[in-house]
């Protein structure tokens, strides 16, 4: 994970330029439709702050985190809120959020670290709340372009976790990246 964080610290401005204006409206709205009107959202690995800003402008309460100090600084400036620097593994809240938005973020965890983090995410959710997450659409796991990636396809993710609420595949919305595919998922925490 340190290699990935170093990548984002060194390339934060270029990353923001390539992602801040990406049109995530369809995924954002699918996610928001599942939340109460005054929902509290954790933007877990907020990157540029694009989605945090969108949710704030829609009137939601948002807590934003990222593992990269430089992305936290720049996203905080963009969104107007403090972005907490933390690793995914450091999430330690209980029943706080109505939704967790982990857009193209937890895919940077090795598969063996991913399930414990998803379990922590579920603990941080209120009952019957949802997680949105997305992964590059393939079966690759390892370092690519200076960052670690765990990719999934529908069948491999279903084998990995059994609580999928909804899934869909989209093309990359960044300019020049339309040939790249993404697996989008909504997971629901069920009341026990």
What are these model-predicted stretches?
Residues 98:
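Conserved acidic residues
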Residues 110, 125-126:
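Helix-to-beta-strand junctions that scaffold the AdoMet/dcAdoMet cofactor pocket
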Residues 1-95, 112-116, 120, 130-192:
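Class I (Rossmann-like) S-adenosyl-L-methionine-dependent methyltransferase catalytic domain
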Residues 101-102:
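A conserved beta-strand element that flanks and buttresses the S-adenosyl-L-methionine
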Residues 105:
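Hydrophobic adenine-recognition pocket in adenosine-nucleotide-binding enzymes
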